[in-house]
């Protein structure tokens, strides 16, 4: 008598359509460079290459991109004017603003974030310098991939499959003469440190500016009694503007850290773009120590140097917070903070723009709490007031 044994079928791995990226920039050189980088990646494709914001607004419904790289300065319709029109036509479009490092463009980039842009990326002054071009390429592809993960489409197969929209290229003008939800699997939580914290450290990246402004507005009672040190992945000029926004949001003094500056309660210190911010003991004082060394975790400033250096000064009396951001910066430093007896809190997945940095900390099992952004401030106020629950 033979017995038929049914073999268990192994499900095919989920496959996704390449991310469709719309590149909008009036420079044919920049468009060409970005397009070549994107086309070289297996998980993304250039859906449209366009010269003006007006072209983008007119074609977005037909092109159906997942991500738009939108230059700020363009003829006919600039990026900040095109932004709300694009989102009105495609609500879930991920828009990354691109601009050169000027104060005006930094201000516009912050305005764009408040209008619905997902992120920004600084363009190098010249793409002829190999190192600058490579940093731009790395950051751009990482942002497209991380932010685009929220809208990736599964591959459709079978008779009902719908063809992807056509690829659109810019028509060059004639030359002018002379001119989340939170994770389903529970994550390990650690007990809060028994040591009362004497400093608040915060690390953030993508989505960080908006998250930081929300958080500092909620923790005035903490800022008044303790120093707050922040590292946000951000270039020079942009950090200057961010410090001004943090001062307005918190109604407390906030500025970029200055090398050798004595750290005092009642102040918010922000790592300046292009330099790591550490802390050190100098005589009887605790001071800011700026570091112009190499990037850490592909970032400068990076969160880990701040977290790790703080242990030498405050030992177990540290409260570290990891907010939204891509990558894993802050996880290693957070581990060291916890090993020294301090505490770490991470933003939850549902309220994060990208759950990379806080997710890395959460999955490492080092967090005393994993909370929505709007609950972190309340938790910090209680902890700094003596609550250890």
Swiss-Prot record:
Gene3D superfamilies noted in UniProt: 3.40.50.2300, Methylesterase CheB, C-terminal domain (3.40.50.180)
The enzyme's E.C. designation: 3.1.1.61, 3.5.1.44
Protein modification: Phosphorylated by CheA. Phosphorylation of the N-terminal regulatory domain activates the methylesterase activity.
Catalytic activity: [protein]-L-glutamate 5-O-methyl ester + H2O = L-glutamyl-[protein] + methanol + H(+); L-glutaminyl-[protein] + H2O = L-glutamyl-[protein] + NH4(+)
SUPFAM superfamilies tied to this protein: CheY-like, Methylesterase CheB, C-terminal domain
Hydrolase keyword on record: yes
Matching Pfam families: CheB_methylest (PF01339), Response_reg (PF00072)
CDD domains membership: CheB_Rec (cd16432), REC_CheB-like (cd17541)
GO molecular function, a single term: protein-glutamate methylesterase activity
Ranges for domain Response regulatory: 20-138
GO cellular component, one term: cytoplasm
Compartments where located: Cytoplasm
PROSITE patterns: CHEB, RESPONSE_REGULATORY
Signal peptide range in chain numbering: none
Residue ranges occupied by any CheB-type methylesterase domain in the UniProt entry: 193-387
One biological process term in Gene Ontology: chemotaxis
Cited InterPro entries: CheB-like (IPR008248), CheB_C (IPR035909), CheY-like_superfamily (IPR011006), Sig_transdc_resp-reg_Me-estase (IPR000673), Sig_transdc_resp-reg_receiver (IPR001789)
Active site: 205, 233, 329
Domain remark from Swiss-Prot or TrEMBL: Contains a C-terminal catalytic domain, and an N-terminal region which modulates catalytic activity.
Family matches, as PANTHER family: PROTEIN-GLUTAMATE METHYLESTERASE/PROTEIN-GLUTAMINE GLUTAMINASE, PROTEIN-GLUTAMATE METHYLESTERASE_PROTEIN-GLUTAMINE GLUTAMINASE 1
Function: Involved in chemotaxis. Part of a chemotaxis signal transduction system that modulates chemotaxis in response to various stimuli. Catalyzes the demethylation of specific methylglutamate residues introduced into the chemoreceptors (methyl-accepting chemotaxis proteins or MCP) by CheR. Also mediates the irreversible deamidation of specific glutamine residues to glutamic acid.
Family of the protein in this entry: Belongs to the CheB family.
NCBIfam families on file: PRK00742.1
Name recorded for this polypeptide: Protein-glutamate methylesterase/protein-glutamine glutaminase 1
UniProt organism field: Rhodopseudomonas palustris (strain BisB18)
């Amino acid at each position: 008598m033979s017995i038929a044994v049914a073999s268990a079928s192994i499900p095919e791995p989920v496959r996704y359509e390449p991310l469709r990226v719309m590149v909008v920039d009036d420079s044919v050189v920049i468009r060409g460079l970005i397009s070549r980088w994107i086309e070289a990646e297996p998980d993304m494709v250039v859906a449209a290459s366009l010269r003006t914001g007006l072209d983008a607004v007119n074609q977005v419904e037909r092109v159906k991109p997942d991500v738009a790289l939108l230059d700020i300065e363009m003829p006919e319709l600039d990026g900040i004017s095109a932004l709300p029109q694009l989102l009105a036509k495609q609500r879930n479009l991920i828009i990354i603003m691109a601009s050169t490092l000027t104060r005006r463009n930094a201000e516009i980039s912050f305005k764009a974030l408040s209008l619905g842009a997902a992120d920004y990326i600084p363009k190098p002054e010249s793409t002829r310098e190999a190192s600058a071009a490579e940093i731009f390429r790395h950051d751009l592809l990482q942002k497209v991939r991380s932010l685009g993960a929220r809208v990736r489409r599964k591959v459709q197969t079978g008779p009902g499959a719908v063809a992807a929209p056509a690829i659109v290229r810019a028509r060059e003008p004639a030359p002018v003469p002379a001119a989340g939800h939170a994770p389903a699997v529970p994550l390990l939580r650690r007990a809060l440190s028994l040591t009362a914290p004497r400093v608040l450290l915060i690390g953030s990246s993508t989505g960080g500016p908006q998250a930081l402004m929300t958080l500092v507005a909620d923790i005035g009672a903490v800022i008044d009694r303790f120093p707050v040190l922040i590292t946000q992945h951000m270039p020079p000029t942009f950090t200057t503007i961010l410090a001004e926004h943090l001062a307005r949001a918190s109604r407390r003094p906030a500025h970029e850290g200055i090398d050798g500056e004595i750290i005092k309660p009642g102040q918010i210190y922000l790592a300046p773009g292009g330099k790591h911010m550490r802390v050190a003991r100098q005589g009887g004082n605790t001071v800011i120590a700026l570091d112009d060394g190499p990037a850490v975790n592909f970032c400068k400033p990076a969160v880990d140097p701040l977290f790790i250096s703080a242990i030498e000064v405050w030992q177990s009396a540290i409260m570290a917070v990891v907010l939204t951001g891509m990558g894993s910066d802050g996880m290693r430093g957070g581990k060291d903070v916890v090993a020294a007896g301090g505490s770490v809190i991470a933003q939850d997945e549902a309220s994060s723009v990208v759950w990379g940095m806080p997710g890395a900390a959460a999955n490492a099992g080092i967090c005393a709490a994993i909370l929505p952004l709007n609950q972190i401030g309340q938790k910090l106020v209680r902890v700094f007031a003596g609550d250890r629950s």
